[in-house]
Curated annotation (Swiss-Prot):
InterPro entries, per database record: LysoPLipid__transptr_LplT, MFS, MFS_trans_sf
Protein localization: Cell inner membrane
Segments on the Cytoplasmic side according to the record's topology features: 39-52, 112-144, 188-226, 278-280, 326-343, 388-397
Source organism of this protein record: Escherichia coli (strain SE11)
UniProt name for this protein: Lysophospholipid transporter LplT
Molecular function per GO: lysophospholipid:sodium symporter activity
Gene, per the UniProt record: lplT
């Protein structure tokens, strides 16, 4: 990995380009692997309610390692942390390829993702500063969503051809991410020399949680992003069951095409947020959050493919406009109070706890036999109400 004493804070520095490429490949692997592994579960006749369990073991790793990964990101050069984390993802994907239980392999990928996330977002504040940070977040989100778009489609299409080919493509993507990480400059650790006593680390993490929760702005950001990503992951699994019921289509590819529409929309929404929203005007994003739930409700009632595509793209636009300013707000305020790595680790805990809760409720609803269309209607209505309540609370405080 190259050494760098002076950091070029340009939005298009070599270091930033390497981060964006590594993020794209890593996120591509994550999303292709999800749909490839779902196809594997179908081929091996796992029950439908087990599909969300796959994502639950993934996010469970985030929650389990949440007290430690922020300190890891702040104690070492973040580029090296990202490279190690992508190596773990590569190992997990390869293990599924070689016949290891898919839930175990996917858990290992989750451990890698848990270590990767604080480093990938924390490094943005080290490679660029000030007004460029929101734009850097926009680039990161755009790269991520482009990877979701292409990775999801690739996973579904390749799985329709051959599941093993789809799994191998995921492993190759993770390998490419490891190589891209080599070109990230070696920056000084943000907070070196911290204690590695697990009890002290847990206590320190809880202190970071408390500090961020007591601050009105960071609490607002944590709740908003947690609701968004919890809902987003649940929507992905909802689509897998909704497509054959509402549209009468039973292949692996169609749900990935529909997910791709959300991804395209988020790219557009993220770009709009970077231009129209600043750290001082974050509340502008809240109406978009409410509209996400409203459009999900309308979408659940559709029975034609073209309106479904259009509505999912609109959901994505609203989502990108909603989440990018909240991410930037947390990074800026969190960097000054608890360190960027710890702030993102706390954010991951909130987001993944929301995912675990929402996926658990969704899996239970499927298990007890509630039809998927009423699930979608209730899901959209509850999300709109939750964001409305958050906005009212934010305006009062």
């Amino acid at each position: 990995m190259s050494e760098s004493v002076h950091t070029n804070t340009s939005l298009w520095s070599k270091g930033m380009k390497a981060v964006i490429v590594a993020q794209f490949l890593s996120a591509f692997g994550d999303n292709a692997l999800l749909f490839a592994t779902l196809a594997l579960l179908n081929a091996q006749f796992y029950p439908e309610w087990s599909q969300p369990i796959l994502q639950m073991v993934f996010v469970g790793a985030y929650i389990l390692f949440a007290p430690f990964v922020g300190q890891v990101a702040d104690s070492f050069a973040k580029g090296r942390v990202m490279m190690f984390a992508n190596g773990l993802k590569l190992l997990g994907a390869a293990s599924i390829c070689f016949g290891i239980n898919p839930f175990l392999g996917y858990t290992l990928v989750g451990v890698g993702a848990a270590a990767y996330s604080p480093a990938k977002y924390g490094i943005l504040g080290e490679l660029t500063t000030g007004s460029k940070l929101v734009k850097a977040n926009g680039l990161m989100e755009a790269s991520t969503i482009a990877a979701i778009l292409l990775g999801s489609v690739a996973g579904g299409v390749l799985a329709d051809w051959h599941v093993l080919v789809a799994l191998a493509a995921c492993a190759l993507a993770y390998g490419g991410a490891v190589v891209a990480n080599i070109y990230i400059p070696k920056l000084a650790a943000a907070r070196p020399g911290q204690s590695w006593n697990l009890i002290n680390m847990t206590r320190s993490f809880l202190n970071a949680c408390t500090s961020l929760w007591r601050n009105g702005e960071t609490r607002f950001s944590l709740v908003g992003t947690s609701l968004f990503w919890g809902a987003g992951v649940t929507l992905r699994f909802l689509l897998v069951l909704w497509v054959p019921v509402a549209l009468g289509i039973t292949d692996n590819a169609t749900p990935t095409y529909l997910n791709a529409m959300v991804a395209i929309g988020i790219v557009v929404g993220a770009g709009a947020a970077a231009k129209l929203v600043t750290l001082e005007t974050v509340s502008r994003c809240m109406p978009a959050g409410i509209l996400i739930g409203v459009v999900v409700l309308i979408f659940s009632l559709q029975h034609e493919l073209l309106p479904a595509y259009a509505l999912l793209m609109l959901i994505g636009v609203m989502g990108g406009f909603f989440v990018v300013p909240l991410n930037a707000l947390l990074q800026e305020r969190g960097k000054k109070s608890v360190g960027a790595g710890n702030a993102i680790a706390v954010q991951n805990l909130g987001e993944n706890s929301a995912m675990l809760l929402m996926l658990g409720i969704y899996s239970l609803a499927v298990m007890i036999g509630i039809p998927v269309v009423p699930i979608g209607i209730g899901f959209g209505a509850l999300f709109a109400l939750a964001i409305t309540a958050l906005w009212i609370w934010q305006r009062r405080h």
